[in-house]
Amino acid sequence: MALRILITVSLVLFSLSHTSFGYSPEEVKSWCGKTPNPQPCEYFLTQKTDVTSIKQDTDFYKISLQLALERATTAQSRTYTLGSKCRNEREKAAWEDCRELYELTVLKLNQTSNSSPGCTKVDKQTWLSTALTNLETCRASLEDLGVPEYVLPLLSNNVTKLISNTLSLNKVPYNEPSYKDGFPTWVKPGDRKLLQTTPRANIVVAQDGSGNVKTIQEAVAAASRAGGSRYVIYIKAGTYNENIEVKLKNIMFVGDGIGKTIITGSKSVGGGATTFKSATVAVVGDNFIARDITIRNTAGPNNHQAVALRSGSDLSVFYRCSFEGYQDTLYVHSQRQFYRECDIYGTVDFIFGNAAVVLQNCNIFARKPPNRTNTLTAQGRTDPNQSTGIIIHNCRVTAASDLKPVQSSVKTFLGRPWKQYSRTVYIKTFLDSLINPAGWMEWSGDFALNTLYYAEYMNTGPGSSTANRVKWRGYHVLTSPSQVSQFTVGNFIAGNSWLPATNVPFTSGL
């Protein structure tokens, strides 16, 4: 009997030590050794007292996600106290960006943690990739305005590393076969109809008073009182000098056509804004759709970064739209995006960001730059497990009217690596003679040349020859459909699961 009691007490004490005092050092080292950043994993896992059993990889993934969420929530709470410590307008502007971006990070981590049964690993990888991108954007805002990082000490490398660990544990193959043929399948049938017909508007914007409201922002505000279903804002022909923020889900902008319905702004880094806040139109709410609209930033070629559109909207679609600016025109910030039959004008890094984005049947126009060099893309992937990249499929790359007379004196490149794992692919795209024979340009010395992924597949036109392209380890000339299939609409942005509902035409494969 005494032996039985002793064994029982020993088992209870072992159980208490395991549940009340954290994981054993052996467990911690074994599991954290599977991540790219074991040190913060070991530290925070050791500190954890509300432990749950780790028996398999899925258990560890859940705990890794929980650690990232806990640290991100702590970092977010600190941002609220930092506003009063800002010493000038530049520091305040950077702080406001970081506050918003940490809120979005916590939102995405919660979305990943509390995802519905229908949520796929691709969805989770998208949201984790976005959470990581948000933290990087906070740092970029400090750099834009020359604010030293010690002024805003919320920038926790631990949060970044913990999210990176969770990304590596989710392990999504790029060609996961979970979609049907047709449009990217995240587009619902009702949304598809909206894009193929003239939809009935919930509200009409008209400068002459013939609509319900005179400004677009008024219409967006009205949508907040309408519930969460698809809300169509018809914007009549005219030039609207506004800076628009769309934070609600399921908003649709419908205009009267490119060059007819024009939204214009002029904020820029040169004028004191961050790149993030310079956008004429900024969209965060998921499932955003825009059709038949021009969006401009008129800050000019010498005011540095000046964004026309910034989209961080998951499952967003832009159809027959024009984006016009110079440096950093189209900010494909994060999440899954699709552009069809759009025009994009710019000079330096004018398609940039860290979304999983496909541009299909679009016209890309390089303008006359201030410094005799154009770069079409600057993709911002910071982690090898982020499911992000810029895919340019069946588009046309040509010189804009202001560049044509001086084209021979300007070097125009397909892109350059903004971040360590930058990924950009051109597929079956017409490249005119403006493209430099080297094709691609360095960002700074040999930075990222071995870790980037740049590729070309069956492009045409006088600028498409790969004979004199760069010889970087990360550059690839693809020669077979199997090599490029992971970058199609169907696979790269899971287009077959959401695009059909928008009624935007798209090509799922090559």
From Swiss-Prot:
Gene name per UniProt: PECS-2.1
Tissue-wise expression: Expressed at low levels in young leaves, young bark, young fruit, mature fruit vesicles, shoots and flower buds, young bark and juice vesicles. In both leaf and fruit abscission zones, and mature leaves, expression was initially undetectable but increased markedly following ethylene treatment.
Sugar-modified residues: N110, N158, N371, N385
The organism of origin for this protein: Citrus sinensis
Signal peptide per UniProt: 1-19
Miscellaneous section: The PMEI region may act as an autoinhibitory domain and prevent untimely PME activity during transport.
Pfam family, one: PMEI
Cysteine disulfide links: C342-C362
Protein name: Pectinesterase 2
Biochemical pathway: Glycan metabolism; pectin degradation; 2-dehydro-3-deoxy-D-gluconate from pectin: step 1/5
Catalytic reaction(s) noted: [(1->4)-alpha-D-galacturonosyl methyl ester](n) + n H2O = [(1->4)-alpha-D-galacturonosyl](n) + n methanol + n H(+)
InterPro entries (alphabetical): Carb-bd_sugar_hydrolysis-dom (IPR006633), Invertase/methylesterase_inhib (IPR035513), Pectin_lyas_fold (IPR012334), Pectin_lyase_fold/virulence (IPR011050), Pectinesterase_Asp_AS (IPR033131), Pectinesterase_cat (IPR000070), Pectinesterase_inhib_dom (IPR006501), Pectinesterase_Tyr_AS (IPR018040)
E.C. number: 3.1.1.11
List of residues binding substrate: T275, Q305, R416, W418
The keyword Protein transport belongs to this UniProt entry's keyword annotation: no
GO molecular function, one term: enzyme inhibitor activity
PROSITE patterns on file: PECTINESTERASE_1, PECTINESTERASE_2
Swiss-Prot/TrEMBL induction comment: By ethylene.
